[in-house]
Amino acid sequence: MINVEIVRHYNKWREHKQINKSLIKKITQNILLRFDNFSKIKQFELSILLTNAAEILILNKQFRNIEKATNVLSFPSNELNWQDLYSKLEFLGDSDYMHLGDIAFCYEVIYNESCEQHKTFENHFIHLLIHSILHLIGFDHQNDTEANIMENLEIEILSYFGIFPPY
């Protein structure tokens, strides 16, 4: 089971009814089912903040020391490495619960990017959600090899949901 908490700090998000707990759960589940080691976990939790440029700028400055609004920020609850997902998740011990982390999305940046890239707002959000969840479970793009692995997985998941790959 995946429990999703959504907090909306910006009313423009309400215009996008398709962006809801059901969608987020479906995408999260699709990602987690790709890794056998997550099968022993019975309950996952994920927190989503849907906010605006002013708030994301504060968060980006506070946590990354970057004074600029960004499309999305991911805050993993666990220090995972994607390579460990194929072996045992020993840090969980006997627990069958895992808080994946928190993700903050910025409406204005996502809106502007979707217009510039000729995508629907929802499809761009889905791509960023996939990207963020992959960060929460230990994927990164600090070098070309990691970036290729992460991008290929994003493309595979986006294709599953009928969304044209952005790369």
Curated annotation (Swiss-Prot):
Binding-site positions, Zn(2+): H131, H135, H141
Q: Where in the cell is it found?
A: Cytoplasm
Query: What does the record give as EC number?
Result: 3.1.-.-
What domain of life is recorded for the organism?
Answer: Bacteria
Which is an annotated GO molecular function term of this record?
A: RNA endonuclease activity
**Chief subcellular location:** cytoplasm
Question: InterPro entries recorded for this chain?
Answer: MetalPrtase_cat_dom_sf_prd (IPR023091), YbeY (IPR002036), YbeY_CS (IPR020549)
Q: Please list the cofactors this protein needs.
A: Zn(2+)
What is the cofactor note? Binds 1 zinc ion.
Its GO biological process terms? rRNA processing
Gene3D superfamilies documented for this protein: Metalloproteases ('zincins'), catalytic domain
Which SUPFAM superfamilies does its entry note?
Metalloproteases ('zincins'), catalytic domain
Q: Name one GO cellular component term.
A: cytoplasm
Annotated keywords? Cytoplasm, Endonuclease, Hydrolase, Metal-binding, Nuclease, Ribosome biogenesis, rRNA processing, Zinc
Function recorded in the entry: Single strand-specific metallo-endoribonuclease involved in late-stage 70S ribosome quality control and in maturation of the 3' terminus of the 16S rRNA.
Into which family does the record put it? Answer: Belongs to the endoribonuclease YbeY family.
Q: Return the protein name.
A: Endoribonuclease YbeY
Lineage of source species? Bacteria, Pseudomonadati, Pseudomonadota, Alphaproteobacteria, Rickettsiales
